[in-house]
Regions:
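Short non-domain terminal segments
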Residues: 1-2, 18, 31, 57, ...
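Fungal secretory targeting signals
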Residues: 1-25
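Extracellular glycan/ECM-engagement signal in secreted proteins
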Residues: 20-56, 105-174
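Short, well-structured hydrophobic secondary-structure segments
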Residues: 53-100
Length: 174
């Protein structure tokens, strides 16, 4: 009985050791990158970089700028897209769930891991179709800068003239 208790304690201590978790996370992470718009249906929405626009404690909207120095650096951690906002907290890409029958929804960069299901293919960053992802959308919106949205794939949306469908290309920083 004492042997079993000792082994259980040993396994728990090893499993809780942060050294093992850090190594596992690092092996699943990609090189750092910026997300840059391409193939926009409106030319003025090409070559823009995603950055976190602060909207409240722990909350940011994903907006866009032509200034690469303002761009937020991202990386893929498994199937989570996370951002390095120079804080001790993880910041995750978070496409907001469809709750209001909208044809497109905002994308946020919030404290935490964010949504899972992201991957990179030949057209750039994608999200899970099972979550309703139908592509990326950029609109001139209320922050005084273009804002990033995702298209809800189960509708045939009609976008305002200030919006463009785009791809989010991955531009590695190192």
């Amino acid at each position: 009985m004492k042997l079993l208790s000792t082994l259980t304690l040993l396994v728990s201590a090893v499993a809780a050791n942060p050294m093992f978790h850090t190594a596992r996370q690092a092996s699943n992470a990609t090189k750092p990158f910026h997300l840059k718009t391409a193939d926009a249906s409106n030319e003025k929405h090409n070559d823009l970089y995603v950055y976190a626009y602060h909207t409240g404690a722990g909350f940011n909207d994903a907006v866009l700028t032509s200034d690469v120095d303002t761009a937020s650096t991202a990386f893929l951690n498994g199937t989570y897209t996370q951002f390095d906002l120079k804080t001790p907290f993880p910041w995750g890409f978070n496409p907001i769930a469809v709750t209001n029958y909208a044809q497109w929804e905002p994308v946020e960069i919030n404290v935490g891991y964010g949504a899972e299901g992201f991957f990179i293919n030949s057209t750039g960053l994608q999200w899970s179709e099972q979550q309703g992802f139908g592509g990326w959308l950029v609109c001139d919106w209320y922050h005084g800068a273009p804002q990033l949205f995702y298209i809800y794939r189960y509708d045939e949306p009609k976008f305002p003239s200030s919006c463009s469908t785009v791809n989010l290309q991955v531009e590695y920083t190192s």
